[in-house]
Amino acid sequence: MKPATHPPALLAAILACHIGLASAQITTPSPGTYVRKGGGGDLVVQAGGKFHIQTVGANGHTCELEGTITNGRARMANSACAVDFTPAGQRVGVDTATADACRDFCGMRAWFGGDYLRPTPGCTDKAIAASRRNFKRAYDAKDYRLALTTLAPVLQDCDEVLTGVTKGWLRNDLALAQLRSGDAAACRQTLAPLAEEAGKTDQELREVYPPTDADVVLPMLKAARTNLRLCS
């Protein structure tokens, strides 16, 4: 019996279909929640390519987009805005060649482009909140060694998905635990990245930051000022 043969046109169609499916699998991010590098936003991808992006920019301005990703691209309804998605391992690059049209989905000081990362299990919002609660419990019980081993990995391992303000509060908490455990030098070292801004007056800081951002940043820097004095 002769083996079955297919006309060249049919073979080409079958090959094109397989290539198309492979391309879709490669260029559509896996379902899950991805955090924008540096914090301040997330990308949620559902089965079938449905997605939702929400980010927060300067002065509380935001972006919000949703749609369906097809072959690495999503076109916004009733708009010329098209968003491109480039998965690479546990990251997804988000970009657009239609920035002007996509501005309709953002406040003046916000944007959504950039790298989005799938957080490790210890760096999800829920896991970080649990670590901070456990830290406080250990700190209040004066078990400073346990407090340090509970919170230090968050600052070290979750750096890429934390906002600057969140990192600042983590540093303040860790510095106090280090001080209470008798290591003032470690306290100063932990707070060193905050020292320059903490050394400025409130007025100087308000001249640097937009109003809403200043309201968020100032309490953290005031705590750093106090803790730097305690560690000195």
Show which residues each predicted segment covers.
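Edge beta-strand at a domain terminus
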Residues: E66-N71, T98-S131
